[in-house]
A protein has these predicted regions:
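Nucleotidyl polymerases of mobile genetic elements and RNA viruses
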Residues: 1-206
Length: 206
């Protein structure tokens, strides 16, 4: 997993911890505040994250990451022929096939979810400018622990790119960002031309 999942995703990857995310966010806030850096943090709320994992998308993602067909087939067995029923007005409806979601209690749940989300995170790393600290060449774009994803932005352009990428990913994977529950924080000295529009998160800047 550590060879496939980028180091900024710490969920269910050996030698990584939620503590890494906490320290990173803390340091970004402290450094941005003390140096007056133009930094924005957007915490994405994934709507019913684990329940919206599309099985077909997950299998194809695993293939693209180089997992063998034998391993994929074994995992598919665990998720094949799953049915569910709904109870409506005291009566059970006819069973229907379940084609989404990673199973609660499954030992592979965390790893499968991290794999399903990694294509989105890869695209964000490539396209969002993020934060570059003085003295460092590499930019920091995000911090993720499972579906808890915080994206670092530099200006309105980053916000525009972020929204477009999440919309395209939703169309491909069935994942969905709930912008009404997402949060954002502006730190440092923002210049008027580059300040993100507050309307994109329904005035949820705080």
């Amino acid at each position: 997993m550590e060879q496939v999942i980028h180091r900024d995703q710490t969920y269910c990857v050996p030698s990584r911890s939620l503590v890494d995310n906490i320290y990173l966010i803390r340091d970004v806030l402290e450094v941005s505040g003390s140096l007056g850096l133009q930094t924005g943090l957007i915490s994405l709320d994934q709507e019913k994250a684990f329940d919206r994992v599309e099985h077909g998308f997950l299998w194809e993602t695993m293939r693209r990451f180089g997992f063998g067909e034998g391993l994929i087939a074994k995992i598919q067995v665990l998720y094949s022929d799953i049915e569910s029923v709904l109870k409506i007005n005291g009566s059970l409806c006819a069973p229907f096939r379940v084609c989404r979601g990673v199973r609660q209690g499954c030992a592979l749940l965390g790893m499968l979810y991290a794999l399903s989300l990694e294509p989105l995170l890869q695209k964000l790393r490539l396209c969002v400018y993020g934060l570059v600290l003085p003295g460092f060449r590499n930019n920091m774009v995000l911090s993720a622990y499972a579906d808890d994803v915080v994206v670092f932005i530099k200006d309105q352009q980053d916000v525009t790119v972020l929204t477009k990428i999440t919309e395209k990913f939703s169309a491909l994977s069935a994942a969905r960002v709930n912008w009404g529950k997402s949060e954002a924080l502006a730190v440092g000295e923002w210049s008027a031309p580059s300040s993100p529009s507050r309307s994109f998160l329904e005035e949820r800047w705080f």
